[in-house]
Amino acid sequence: QIQYHKVVKGETLESISRKRGVTIAQICKLNHITKKMKLRPGQILRYS
């Protein structure tokens, strides 16, 4: 099942990966982004 995370101000890929129990690489692959991309509050990310 696909799950989503809504980015809030101050979050990073690292903090989201820890919170959701997935790797940064998994988040990047599912969302077609790179580690260096800036996240925006309100952005929706898939994480599983």
Regions found by a protein language model. Give the residues of each.
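Short, surface-exposed secondary-structure edge patches
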Residues: 35-37
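Primarily a LysM-type cell-wall glycan-binding module
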Residues: 1-29, 40-47
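Short, small/polar residue-rich loop motifs at catalytic or cofactor-binding pockets
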Residues: 32
